[in-house]
């Protein structure tokens, strides 16, 4: 029997019935369940639901076969961070607003979950960024993007970028986003970056509020090694990986490249990125 870990976040009360229906369907099938501690607390306290589980988890155990993420894109990114290098397949169940990364909506999840239990699904792989600081720390990974941002609101920073040791440019801006195809519909898009199909092997460098009008987003092959160095009036800058923020001194440079592993996303039905653009982003819709 396949073991399943469930990660999630607090949801609106009207979604409670759908959440319970999904977990009960897994219980009825005899599926060994491991539920994230914070999410289990929500189920018990807010929904008065006490599922039969094999264990309470804070991090993802190695023996898990599948992961189910119940939430929006933020919860999905947090779950992807938990999966790390293990490449355990993850199913995203959307209980948030946009849910661009999630596969199924909450109200239909209990009907489709049988396909997961029967092995009737496909796997879609997504590329990841590997981010290394030159201070000798271990690599970190991001599904969507790595963003270098200024720490002080009143001044810009300068981000010097090199591609495969070839100097590219100095970005005088509020920051610089390096996004994967998955992240091209996230922070990068708000900076007028292009949308990149998930199967494309590219990264996009998107400046945030650049001082120069000719500093446009740039698409590069994902076998490119990107080196970023920061110059700022402040002694520090922010490095943000899929919403996880840390402060670094300006003398710390960043190396970005394609990670050697991928994120494996479970698709319970035929998936069309074009349909996702139309449905989630109102692509081509005549909105008046």
Curated annotation (Swiss-Prot):
Catalysis: reaction(s): NAD(+) + ATP = ADP + NADP(+) + H(+)
Assigned keywords, A-Z: ATP-binding, Cytoplasm, Kinase, NAD, NADP, Nucleotide-binding, Transferase
HAMAP family in the record: NAD_kinase
Cited Pfam families: NAD_kinase, NAD_kinase_C
Native source organism of the sequence: Porphyromonas gingivalis (strain ATCC BAA-308 / W83)
Residues that bind NAD(+): 73-74, 78, 144-145, 174, 185-190, 209
GO molecular function terms attached to this record: ATP binding; metal ion binding; NAD binding; NAD+ kinase activity
Localisation: Cytoplasm
Lineage top rank: taxon: Bacteria
Descriptive protein name: NAD kinase
